Every structure is written in structure tokens, then in C-alpha cells.
Regions:
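Core catalytic region of metal-dependent phosphoesterases/phosphodiesterases
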Residues: 6-12, 25-31, 35, 40-123
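Short, acidic/polar N-cap/turn motifs at the starts of alpha helices
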Residues: 22, 124-128, 200, 221
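Binuclear metal-dependent phosphoesterase catalytic core
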Residues: 26-29, 190, 194-236
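Active-site-proximal beta-strand elements of phosphoester/diester hydrolases
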Residues: 30-39, 133-140, 210-214
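Structural motif
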Residues: 59, 171, 208-211
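Divalent metal-dependent hydrolysis catalytic cores, especially in the metallo-beta-lactamase
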Residues: 65, 177, 181, 215
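Conserved catalytic scaffold of divalent metal-dependent phosphoesterases
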Residues: 73-74, 79-173, 177-187
């Protein structure tokens, strides 16, 4: 499985389908763990990584908001957990706020070398990953700041329907909203459904899906089996 990471100078743009910046193909295997919205909770993030490793995930992806803009301790430890475990990650709105604060000279009680390393880490994060018709993003999979600030789940299917109309993604895995939720496109109809805890979701070829994984800070993560084409919600 080939995956492409999209990086870009982040600007506000009213066009949701702006062309992405640079493409860097990566190789993924069949079992993928997904984590989102750990918000500086290093214990919960580590527990998610361990649970997904126990499930023999070949790759683990963090879907953004690794940090919390209001929590400035353990920043370097969080970066170490991500890098030491070879976690792929996309940028969330809280990560962007931390990045901008550091760029604007906020010391955050960090050594200069740690501050520089955290800045480099945040700058390196992709806005989203794609692999064929599968996408991993913090929220909406478009190339602008607005995309990772605006939630897909607003209690209706409006934003999900827009994504289904404007993209070719068969599967989108994202975070931002902290409640696990499924949006399903079937024959032009979009539905909003809870994700069951005990029953794996089997993907159908004639349907499209948006999976909101849920917050690791609240004990949620997910497991994708590409060979079986199933998704499992995992509670810590």
C-alpha cells in the first residue's frame, strides 16, 4: 500500500480543493492503528500505542491534536513518544497553535534546543495523508487552516455530504470531534451513525465512509485491517 503525505504552506483559502504542496510517497502495510486528539495526555497516547501494537498494527497514525494549546509541559516527551514509536502524524489545530506560539517567541519554559526540535517536528507534520482512495486527516481533508479547525460532525450530515461530493476518497479517517462517529454514503444518501464498540465495521465496495475515531484523551482509538476491509473501535 502506497501512501502520500501532503505538505503545504498553510494559508486561509476559500477554495476547499486547493492543490496540495509536496508529495512524498510512503509504504504502509495492511494493519493500521489510528489515534486522534490525545491533547497532551501522554499516558493515554502511550496506552493507545501499546494497545495497537498488541494488535500487531504495522503502522500507527496520529490524526492530529497531539498537543493541547493550553498545556505546555511534557512537550518534548510527547515528541519523543511519537518519534521513538515511528508514529506517522498529521497536524491538528492545537498543534498549529503551539507551532505558531513557538514561532512568535513564546518560551514555554523550554530549553532553546528543545524548542527548536519541537518547532521542526511541528513544521514537518502533513496536513493529511492519502493512499489511493483512503485519506487520513485531522478534520476536513482540504489544504487550508480552516480545514482542520472546522468539524465534520456538527450533529448533521451537511459537512460529510460536502466531503463526499468534493473528494474521491472511499475512506476518510479523522479526529477533531471527540465522539466516535460514522458517516456513510450509500447510493447518494448520507447517514450519521454511532460506531459500535463490539462489532467490527465491514466496508462495502459500493459505499463511502468517514470515520471519526474519537479522542485518545477520552480512551478511544481504532484499528483498520486493510486485507479484511474492516474497522474496529477500541476502548481503553
Amino acid at each position: 500500500m502506497m501512501i502520500e503525505a501532503y505538505f503545504s504552506a498553510i494559508v486561509f483559502d476559500p477554495c476547499p480543493t486547493c492543490p496540495p504542496g509536496l508529495k512524498h510517497p510512503l509504504t504502509l502495510q495492511g494493519r493500521i492503528g489510528v489515534i486522534a486528539d490525545s491533547h497532551g495526555n501522554i499516558a493515554s497516547m502511550t496506552d493507545c500505542i501499546q494497545r495497537l501494537t498488541d494488535r500487531r498494527a504495522d503502522t500507527i497514525i496520529h490524526l492530529g491534536d497531539i498537543f493541547d494549546s493550553e498545556i505546555h509541559h511534557n512537550l518534548m516527551n510527547i515528541v519523543d513518544v511519537i518519534t521513538d514509536n515511528n508514529i506517522l502524524a498529521v497536524k491538528g489545530n492545537n498543534d498549529y497553535q503551539i507551532e505558531k506560539s513557538l514561532e512568535n517567541g513564546h518560551p514555554m519554559d523550554l530549553d532553546p534546543s528543545d524548542r527548536q526540535r519541537i518547532r521542526q517536528f511541528l513544521h514537518s507534520l502533513a496536513l493529511y495523508f492519502t493512499s489511493g482512495n483512503v485519506c487520513f486527516a485531522h478534520s476536513r481533508p482540504f489544504d487550508s487552516i480552516r480545514a482542520f479547525y472546522e468539524p465534520i460532525d456538527t450533529g448533521s450530515t451537511e459537512q460529510a455530504a460536502r466531503i463526499f461530493r468534493h473528494t474521491d476518497h472511499h475512506l476518510l479517517f479523522c479526529g477533531h470531534s471527540h465522539l466516535p462517529m460514522l458517516f456513510r454514503w450509500r447510493a447518494g444518501i448520507v447517514t450519521r451513525e454511532p460506531i459500535p464498540e463490539q462489532t467490527p465495521l465491514v466496508f462495502q465496495k459500493n459505499e463511502k465512509y468517514i470515520i471519526i475515531v474519537g479522542s485518545a484523551d477520552k480512551g478511544e482509538c481504532g484499528f483498520i485491517d486493510r486485507e479484511k476491509m474492516v474497522y474496529e473501535r477500541i476502548r481503553l
